[in-house]
C-alpha cells in the first residue's frame, strides 16, 4: 500500500492558491478516476482509496500536515509515502521529483519531517518566487499564468497515474521530470 498525499490548506479562502497545488492535482486525479474524497475525522483528512493507494488531503492547515499524515500512516501502515507539493524555489512550469532530503523551508514538509521522518518521495511543482513568501504562496495564480499552471498540473496528474499503474518512482521521475518550464502553445 502507498500513501499519496497532496498538501494544501482547507477552506474556500485558500482554494486554488499556489500553496494548494497538491490539493488541486489530487482533486484532478480523483475526478478523472471518477472517485471522490470522504472526510475522515479520525485522521482529520479527506481520503480516497484506489487500488492499493490511499490518497490523502490533510485538513489541518499546511503547518500541521504531519498530524494527518502520521495518523493515516499509523492506521494503514503503507510501505511508501509520496507527497505532492508546491515549491517556490522552482519556476512555474517545472516539475521535479525527489527521494528524501531537506524540506526547503516548506512548512508542510517540516511538519511531516518532524512527526514522520524525511524518508519519502516528493513530487515538487514549481510555483515561482514572489515578493513576500507568505503573501505569494497564499495568492492565486495570475490570469497570464493559468495556461501554464493548468498544463503543469495536468502533467503532474499524469505522472501520478503512471506511478499508480507502475509503482516505479524512478521510472516516473525519468519520464515526467521537467527541468525547464513546460512549453505550451498559445
UniProtKB/Swiss-Prot annotation:
Record EC number: 3.1.1.29
Residues annotated as binding tRNA: 14, 61, 63, 107
GO CC annotations, alphabetized: cytoplasm
Active site: residue positions: 19
Key words, A-Z: Cytoplasm, Hydrolase, RNA-binding, tRNA-binding
Site (Stabilizes the basic form of H active site to accept a proton): 86
Top-level taxon of the source organism: Bacteria
Localization, UniProt: Cytoplasm
Reaction(s) the record says it catalyses: an N-acyl-L-alpha-aminoacyl-tRNA + H2O = an N-acyl-L-amino acid + a tRNA + H(+)
tRNA-binding is among the record's keywords: yes
Site, as annotated: Discriminates between blocked and unblocked aminoacyl-tRNA: 9
Subunit field text: Monomer.
Its biological purpose: Hydrolyzes ribosome-free peptidyl-tRNAs (with 1 or more amino acids incorporated), which drop off the ribosome during protein synthesis, or as a result of ribosome stalling. Catalyzes the release of premature peptidyl moieties from peptidyl-tRNA molecules trapped in stalled 50S ribosomal subunits, and thus maintains levels of free tRNAs and 50S ribosomes.
The protein's name in its UniProt record: Peptidyl-tRNA hydrolase
Organism of origin: Helicobacter pylori (strain HPAG1)
Gene: pth
Amino acid at each position: 500500500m502507498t500513501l499519496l498525499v497532496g498538501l494544501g490548506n482547507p477552506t474556500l479562502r485558500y482554494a486554488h492558491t499556489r500553496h494548494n497545488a497538491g490539493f488541486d492535482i489530487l482533486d484532478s486525479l480523483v475526478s478523472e478516476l471518477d472517485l471522490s474524497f470522504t472526510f475522515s475525522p479520525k485522521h482529520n483528512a479527506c481520503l480516497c482509496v484506489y487500488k492499493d493507494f490511499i490518497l490523502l488531503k490533510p485538513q489541518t492547515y499546511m503547518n500541521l500536515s504531519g498530524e494527518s499524515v502520521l495518523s493515516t500512516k499509523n492506521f494503514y501502515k503503507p510501505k511508501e509515502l509520496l507527497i505532492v507539493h508546491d515549491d517556490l524555489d522552482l519556476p512555474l512550469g517545472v516539475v521535479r521529483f525527489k527521494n528524501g532530503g531537506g524540506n526547503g523551508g516548506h512548512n508542510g514538509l517540516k511538519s511531516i519531517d518532524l512527526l514522520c521522518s524525511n524518508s519519502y518521495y516528493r513530487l515538487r511543482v514549481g510555483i515561482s518566487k514572489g515578493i513576500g513568501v507568505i503573501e505569494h504562496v497564499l495568492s492565486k495564480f495570475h490570469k497570464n499564468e493559468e495556461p501554464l499552471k493548468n498544463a503543469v498540473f495536468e502533467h503532474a496528474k499524469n505522472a501520478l497515474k503512471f506511478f499508480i499503474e507502475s509503482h516505479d518512482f524512478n521510472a516516473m521521475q525519468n519520464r515526467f521530470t521537467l527541468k525547464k518550464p513546460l512549453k505550451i502553445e498559445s
